[in-house]
Amino acid sequence: MNFRREIGVEENKLWSGLEESEDEEERREMKGFELKMIDIVVSMAALAAVLLFVHTNPHPERICWEGSSNAVLSGKIETALKDHQLDEAWDSFNDFKRLYGFPKDTLLGKLITELSYSSDPHWLQKACDLVLLVLKEKSVVLHSDFLTKLSLSLARSQMPIPASTILRVMLEKESLPPMNVLWLVVLHMVKTEIGTYIASNFLVQICDCFQHSSVNQNEQAKLIKPDSMIFNLVLDACVRFKLSFKGHQIIELMPRIGVVADAHSITIIAQIHEMNGQRDELKKFKDHIDRVSAPFVFHYRQFYDSLLSLHFKFNDIDSAASLVLDMYRDWESNLRKELQKPRLVPMGSDNLKSGLKIQIVPEMLQKDSILKVEGKQELITFRNGKLTLSNKALAKLIKGYKRIGKISDLSKLLLSIQKKSHTLGGSSLPSDVIDACIKLRWLETAHDILDDMEAAGAPMGSTTYFSLFAAYYKEKMFRESKALLKQMKKAGLVLNLSDEMVVSICLSEAVDKNAMHAKKSDLAEFLVREMSEENAVPPMVYEFNSSIYFFCKAKMVEDALKTYRRMPEMKIQPTVQTFCNLVYGYSSLEMYRDITIIWGDMKRNMESGNLVVSRDLSEFLLLNFLRGGYFERVMEVIGYMKEHSMYTDKWMYKSEFLKLHKNLYRTLKASKAKTDAQSKRLEYVKAFRKWVGID
């Protein structure tokens, strides 16, 4: 008993000495020394107890060594974890690791799990760091359940970078969280722009891993194949954060790994094609979408909105009008079984035998979807179970027809919409258009539409005639007003009235009508806005970009380059999309040297202030220069991204480097370089290795 009391006194002295030390480094050293002393003293006590036990116990083989500090510290960790005391558990773990290394796998798993349940970013980061440390120093495979819980907790706490680190660790071992859990992880990651960058890159890595496993006929391939929900979450985020080029790359992965695009996918793909100006790609979906049944019409409002927007961007009023008429038709009320089966839509040229074809199922919606697609409502709205034109879309149509002098075609369109919407008698659309033209003093245009409606057997009401007559009178256009007055008398609108009485009535009607619409945001306001706004990108640019895209998809890069060279000759400024198409085309053929030439053009355009390169294009350039071994260009792009505060996914760049150039110049010293070119390249390679944290 005295011996045990002395041990306790000695232990208290050592701990008190540790607590009284003010220097942190000294405290650590003292604590480590104290723990070793405890181990020695406790072992001596245990030995004495054993000797006594041997003399008094007939079964000495049952001797227990629970008195060691190993067990004491393990017990402290266990107790602290049960009591959810993370500070104490972490301190005890560090003490244990300094003396004995890592604790047992089960205890280590409990610690990681308890840290994962914390909502404090501090402890979540500790958990992530611990996992990486274990993988680096301990030859043990951490159970995927621990990593799954941790990745979800990190994502929920808006820590996408460490969350992706854990996911990538799992992917390296060809293991991923269950798909429904991965949905949630990605859902939380893509709430932020940086999270979307990382999630999209991680999806690319999953697809690469899946393709590699499939080639090797690996059974794990089925477990890591991403589904349409993962694609939808990432693509929707690309739309929200305007990552159009990245979105295009993700879309092309779907047919490569055999993922079917559902109704949500199609809607999101439509928005990405709109952002990229790829009208021809979107038109390929139209025949399939036109055949969907009435219950799905609301869902595809965004599809028609995007396609109509592209028609306007291409200044194709005839196609816009045709699309509008298609929208106003009667939709089939019954679901069609054939639209619930996969259908193939080609990507790029239809004539390419080796071209990609994406599978779509227009009437497939996942019941347990966690995605809520919120498209914009700019041109097409949904009212009373039907798709209808917004005032903005109508203003664009009026502007387009007026610019090309085809008012009669506008009148025909308005009349057709009336007939197709089954509201011929009560529709106010033509009169709204005429009123808007009158407010903008486009009196000739208003009169032309009025005449067209009259000739088609659908004359306007007296109020519309009176408004136009009053406008003529105010503008002192007496010849036109007299002609209109004859029309009014012929139509029986002003019988047995003198001209003076007609003028008085018309002016009075016009005043009353203006007062009624004074506070109403109407078509005229949208027309004024449309006329004052110039197209951000001239229609001809979209035409050129479409041609370049077509040639690149057909692997006709020489024709694509010729088309690109014609742009400055015609004084047309290339856009980011122009360079995206070119770089993507050259990359598909692994023509990395040609990409360096395009990069030179891009730099000249940036220096002149005519171009701002997007983050997704910058990253794509960086990866291609890395694959081609152009490290000077790699560091240039990195410098550009730093200068513009763009997030850089170092994990991905590091992985790409190690895959392609792991031993490049690893042992070569600058003094041993044979040429100046090799010396400079060595310098850039070392700079890159240092930047991504290799060596």
What are these regions (language model features)?
Residues 1-695:
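A basic, Ser/Thr-enriched alpha-helical scaffold prevalent
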